[in-house]
């Protein structure tokens, strides 16, 4: 199999995987009504995935040690195919959440396997990692947009049945890949983690991404409920279209080198991204649905700018243990997403939309000040 075909298969698999992860997000108001549960409980369908993505860099290095990458991909895809089809048959909140929890366990294994296949191509590592990031962003957008459309036209159960067919195709394609490498997994030790956290630069970067993804995941998770509050007759298709702005992440990830060149230093780019992120967060106080739609685009530009540059910094500040520093980065990132998928929903339910947005803005002002006061730690700024 040619390198090009192998990459196409991996990109397709990642796209479908991220679609599975985020398909529930625009459907949460519909699922909350279907299962007669609160907004907070409906938000847990996404939060549980984030939680396992957070702990996977820590535990999967031990669980999947010396397992063939293709074997990991095949077994995990079969499990995901079965569970996703089971979602289309679920008739209670408890059953749906249990199945999503099983999916949350296997999704990190597929992501790890896909990244390993791309990383083994040593001559094109940087290009392949850019492709990986773009594929995850594209998958997240496709999953959100199309799940809304399919749910409105054919019912929410068809969303998960159709994704199961897409996973079946992914399993068929993965069988065609000729790849004998082992999964490249980190097995962290407590001493190594503590040693890295003694470097204050990592405290800054990890805190930054915890807060940024808390705000990002939190706001996008409750946005469908806000739209339903403003316009009760809004269809699932229109809610799904709100997430088109997510596609800005592809543009940012593929042009970040030009953005850095313009600002000259990475930390300046981060602070510019935070400024855009804060301004767009405050724009969500507006009650005009059209303005909210375009605000999502600006919101995603700010977030993905910070995320892309922070990833580069986290992977370049140490010559050794890059696998561990990267894994810890992802853990803090997804812990922020997991907490952000639940806690803001509680605040919104108890205190309303405006108070929730002000909470997000306060956190962003705090992290902006923290970065500003810590700038001398980074040579990139000077």
Each language-model region and where it sits:
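Helix-loop-helix hairpin linking two adjacent transmembrane segments in secondary transporters
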Residues: 124-125, 130-178, 222
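Cytoplasmic helix-loop-helix junction between adjacent transmembrane helices
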Residues: 99-136
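Extracytoplasmic
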Residues: 5-39, 57-60, 219-225
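C-terminal transmembrane helical hairpin of 12-TM major facilitator-type secondary transporters
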Residues: 266-310
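Paired small-residue
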Residues: 83, 94-103, 290-298
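Conserved MFS/SLC helix-loop-helix module at the cytosolic interface between two early adjacent transmembrane helices
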Residues: 55-93
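A late C-terminal transmembrane helix in Major Facilitator Superfamily
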Residues: 317-353, 360
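Juxtamembrane intracellular "pre-TM" segments in multi-pass secondary transporters
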Residues: 177-205
């Amino acid at each position: 199999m040619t390198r090009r075909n192998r990459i196409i298969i991996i990109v397709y698999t990642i796209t479908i995987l991220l679609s599975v992860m985020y398909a529930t997000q625009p459907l949460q108001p519909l699922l909350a009504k279907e299962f007669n549960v609160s907004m907070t409980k409906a938000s847990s369908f996404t939060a549980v995935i984030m939680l396992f993505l957070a702990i996977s860099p820590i535990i999967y290095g031990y669980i999947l040690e010396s397992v063939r990458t293709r074997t990991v991909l095949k077994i995990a895809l079969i499990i995901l195919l079965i569970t996703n089809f089971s979602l289309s048959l679920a008739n209670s909140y408890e059953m749906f959440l249990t199945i999503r929890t099983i999916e949350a366990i296997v999704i990190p294994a597929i992501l790890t396997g896909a990244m390993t296949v791309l990383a083994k191509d040593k001559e094109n590592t940087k290009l392949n990692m850019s492709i990986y990031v773009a594929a995850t962003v594209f998958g997240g957008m496709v999953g959100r947009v199309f799940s809304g459309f399919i749910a409105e036209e054919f019912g929410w159960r068809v969303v998960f049945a159709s994704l199961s067919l897409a996973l079946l195709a992914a399993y068929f394609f993965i069988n065609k890949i000729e790849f004998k490498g082992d999964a490249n997994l980190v097995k962290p030790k407590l001493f190594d983690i503590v040693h890295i956290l003694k470097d204050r630069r990592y405290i800054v970067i990890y805190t930054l991404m915890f807060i940024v993804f808390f705000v990002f995941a939190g706001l996008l998770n409750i946005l469908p409920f806000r739209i339903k509050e403003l316009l009760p007759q809004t269809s699932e298709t229109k809610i799904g279209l709100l997430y088109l702005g997510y596609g800005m992440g592809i543009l940012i990830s593929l042009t970040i080198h030009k953005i850095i060149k313009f600002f000259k230093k990475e930390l300046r780019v981060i602070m510019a991204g935070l400024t855009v992120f804060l301004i767009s967060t405050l724009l969500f106080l507006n009650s005009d649905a059209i303005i909210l739609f375009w605000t999502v685009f600006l919101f995603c530009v700010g977030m993905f700018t910070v995320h892309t540059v922070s990833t580069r910094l986290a992977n370049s500040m140490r010559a050794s243990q890059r696998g561990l520093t990267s894994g810890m980065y992802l853990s803090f990132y997804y812990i922020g997403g997991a907490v952000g998928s639940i806690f803001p929903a509680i605040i919104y339910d108890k205190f309303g939309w405006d108070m929730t947005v002000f909470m997000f803005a306060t956190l962003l002002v705090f992290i902006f000040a923290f970065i500003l006061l810590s700038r001398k730690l980074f040579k990139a700024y000077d």
